[in-house]
């Protein structure tokens, strides 16, 4: 299944998106436990932004904070999906550093609130770079 880092740490301005991705993640973990003994593997890939035409076409509608982290390639996400399908992992977060940060912010919500303005500022700068790159 393909989730999102926003399902691990809520994305301001995208409550519905974050909520559905959190539900998908919980479903994947529960289902993985239910079918494990039958040899079926279930997992979730939780990427941040993916460098595709879709995100670049919608860049003005995407929250700045999304661009505070490196974008993954579609190929890297596909590789992660294959890793899940082979049963090597239950979850892959991409990029891994962002996965660690959202896990930390889950346990320490005040840290998330403290970091948010800094991540928005970084994301704004990166967003401008992406706009120029694709101009």
Predicted regions: what they are:
Residues 4:
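Residue(s) in the substrate-gating loop at a strand-loop-helix junction
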Residues 11-15:
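Active-site loop immediately N-terminal to the catalytic Tyr-X3-Lys motif
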Residues 20:
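Active-site helix of classical SDR
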Residues 69-70, 75-135:
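C-terminal tail/cap regions
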Residues 7-9:
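Conserved catalytic-site region of short-chain dehydrogenase/reductase
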């Amino acid at each position: 299944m393909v989730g999102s880092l926003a399902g691990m740490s809520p994305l301001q301005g995208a409550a519905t998106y974050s909520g559905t991705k959190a539900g998908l993640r919980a479903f994947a973990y529960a289902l993985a436990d239910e079918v494990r003994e039958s040899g079926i593997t279930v997992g979730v890939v939780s990427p941040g932004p993916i460098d595709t035409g879709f995100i670049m076409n919608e860049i003005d509608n995407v929250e700045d904070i999304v661009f505070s982290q490196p974008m993954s390639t579609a190929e890297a996400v596909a590789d992660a999906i294959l890793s899940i399908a082979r049963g090597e992992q239950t979850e892959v977060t991409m990029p891994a550093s962002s996965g660690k940060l959202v896990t930390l912010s889950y346990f320490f919500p005040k840290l998330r609130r403290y970091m948010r303005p800094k991540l928005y500022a970084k994301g704004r700068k990166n967003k401008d770079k992406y706009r120029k790159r694709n101009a």
